[in-house]
């Protein structure tokens, strides 16, 4: 039996400096690469937005997988002040085909 599907959105403050070697884009690219690898393995999908020093992300999937993903994000040194904005049960996913889409 499959656990309940959920959609969870959060916002967090990025901790990396704007003058890092390779620029912000390289740091976000590393986050995306890691997210896509992890998420496809556990069937979590969603979209990530980064702008003005903040992340906004929507995650969808099995409740336990999404909550495990959020726990990893909360412990990631690149995020600070993780605030859950929405946590709802869903019948169907909007981002089923995306392990992690990026929006600027």
Model-derived regions, located:
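Charge-rich, low-complexity N-terminal segments
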Residues: 1-104
